[in-house]
């Protein structure tokens, strides 16, 4: 009798989970993307009046911002470009351009390897989605800046200059995220030097 009851309950449970009320995957994805767009717009609206600031994290119930020097500064503009790519909302495009512009000064960064993902997440996606030629100059200047971190004797791009008393030539896996911009620069200019650095 125990086995019968166990199998009956298991059968009822499985029948209840059969999925007859499940939404198609496409619907679930569309809802998730619509929610992401709403949340991204809320963040962009909140930060639009904070000149030069970019969202960074949430700590102790408060949002924390950064300027463009933070190593992840290109990520939020990149998110805006991806959200724009999905829905083609003109408001998202406006914010993507605004927050991308906030990162432009990093094209001259030569003291760390982060310039690749500061710029390629933002300006790279902006160029890909809009064809805005002004973004090319930013990316090329950034690629030249990043290439200054390469040391031919070592064959690598140095990650940082700090802690020289601990590290001779620090290189971390994040460097891989910078290579795409260098490959783009070689393809765009026909100059193999960027590819060779990568």
Can you say where each PLM-predicted feature lies in the sequence?
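Sec-dependent N-terminal signal peptides
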Residues: 4-14
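Glycan-recognition and catalytic cores of secretory/periplasmic carbohydrate-active enzymes
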Residues: 21-198
